[in-house]
Each structure stands twice: as structure tokens, then as C-alpha cells.
UniProtKB/Swiss-Prot annotation:
The keyword Glycoprotein applies. InterPro entries: ASFV_fam_110. This is Protein MGF 110-4L. Glycans are attached at residue 64. The lineage of its organism: Viruses, Varidnaviria, Bamfordvirae, Nucleocytoviricota, Pokkesviricetes. Residues 1-18 form the signal peptide. Belongs to the asfivirus MGF 110 family.
Length: 124
């Protein structure tokens, strides 16, 4: 009975968090997560390049429209994300990993926000 309850709870958590219920909820390591999952991944690691649309050196966040435009710089990192059971992982490609429970996510934005340059019209 407890196993059934926990299974149902897990499915509900995936729906609330916007994670798919595909085969075990797994996602192989990728730098291009499914479009429907960007809201989840980009909330907890907003400096990933796949979260931004850049043109002519100015970038707009694909998910959070209230984010200011930024200048494309070292703030944006090439991330790979993966999910195995309830473990969500961000890899920044330089040996830095951020691992968290998918159902209890913890943002990992602070170290990168120090490098973010907000676009000002005078920057042109």
C-alpha cells in the first residue's frame, strides 16, 4: 500500500514540476533538453546557454520574460542536464556538477550572477 502511495506521489510531483512521466522519468545527458522542460531546468540554473536566445551579442531569456536583456558574455555556460530517477544533474563541462533531488530543487544561480552584464542602451 505504501509503495502504491509513493508511486502516485511521484507521478504527481513530476506533473507539478513540469517533468515528463516518460520511461522512468529519465533524461540522458543533453545540452538541449526538451522544450517542455525548459521552465524547470532554466529556473534552477538560469546561466545555461539553452535558456537564452542571443542575437548580435544581446540575449533574451526564453522562459522568464521578466529577466532583463543581457550582454552575451562568460555568464552563459554550456550546460548538460540529466535526470535519473529523482536525481537531476547540471554539468557545466569544467568538472563542476550540481546535483539535486528533482522533487526538491535548489537553485544554483548565485555563482554565475556575479558575471552577468545587463544590457543598457548605452552599450551599443
Amino acid at each position: 500500500m505504501l509503495v502504491i502511495f509513493l508511486g502516485i506521489l511521484g507521478l504527481l510531483a513530476n506533473q507539478v514540476l513540469g517533468l515528463p512521466t516518460q520511461a522512468g522519468g529519465h533524461l540522458r545527458s543533453t545540452d538541449n533538453p526538451p522544450q517542455e522542460e525548459l521552465g524547470y531546468w532554466c529556473t534552477y540554473m538560469e546561466s545555461c546557454k539553452f535558456c537564452w536566445e542571443c542575437a548580435h551579442g544581446i540575449c533574451k531569456n526564453k522562459v522568464n520574460t521578466s529577466m532583463p536583456l543581457i550582454i552575451e558574455n562568460s555568464y552563459l555556460t554550456s550546460c548538460e542536464v540529466s535526470r535519473w530517477y529523482n536525481q537531476c544533474t547540471y554539468s557545466e563541462g569544467n568538472g563542476h556538477y550540481h546535483v539535486m533531488d528533482c522533487s526538491d530543487p535548489v537553485p544554483h544561480n548565485r555563482p554565475h550572477q556575479l558575471l552577468r552584464k545587463i544590457y543598457e542602451k548605452e552599450d551599443l
